[in-house]
């Protein structure tokens, strides 16, 4: 089974080797015919501490690193 990959924005980068990434998910409600935007936050592992707040990053599913970290940063574009 392929690993999930999401594109998001770094919202918090204060901890060591850890960043909080906000991912936008857009879907259409079939009943009300309305487009809904939903943000979900993921805790991701940043090995080199290279990400800053506001950076666009690609995160990929990974085996659990800690209690809440189950994602790893694959690509960071500044």
Curated annotation (Swiss-Prot):
<protein>
    <recommendedName>
        <fullName>Small ribosomal subunit protein uS17</fullName>
    </recommendedName>
</protein>
<keyword id="KW-0699">rRNA-binding</keyword>
<dbReference type="GO" id="GO:0006412">
    <property type="term" value="P:translation"/>
</dbReference>
<comment type="subunit">
    <text>Part of the 30S ribosomal subunit.</text>
</comment>
<comment type="similarity">
    <text>Belongs to the universal ribosomal protein uS17 family.</text>
</comment>
<dbReference type="GO" id="GO:0019843">
    <property type="term" value="F:rRNA binding"/>
</dbReference>
<comment type="function">
    <text>One of the primary rRNA binding proteins, it binds specifically to the 5'-end of 16S ribosomal RNA.</text>
</comment>
<dbReference type="InterPro" id="IPR019984">
    <property type="entry name" value="Ribosomal_uS17_bact/chlr"/>
</dbReference>
<keyword id="KW-0689">Ribosomal protein</keyword>
<dbReference type="InterPro" id="IPR012340">
    <property type="entry name" value="NA-bd_OB-fold"/>
</dbReference>
<dbReference type="GO" id="GO:0003735">
    <property type="term" value="F:structural constituent of ribosome"/>
</dbReference>
<keyword id="KW-0694">RNA-binding</keyword>
<dbReference type="InterPro" id="IPR000266">
    <property type="entry name" value="Ribosomal_uS17"/>
</dbReference>
<dbReference type="Pfam" id="PF00366">
    <property type="entry name" value="Ribosomal_S17"/>
</dbReference>
<dbReference type="InterPro" id="IPR019979">
    <property type="entry name" value="Ribosomal_uS17_CS"/>
</dbReference>
<keyword id="KW-0687">Ribonucleoprotein</keyword>
<dbReference type="GO" id="GO:0022627">
    <property type="term" value="C:cytosolic small ribosomal subunit"/>
</dbReference>
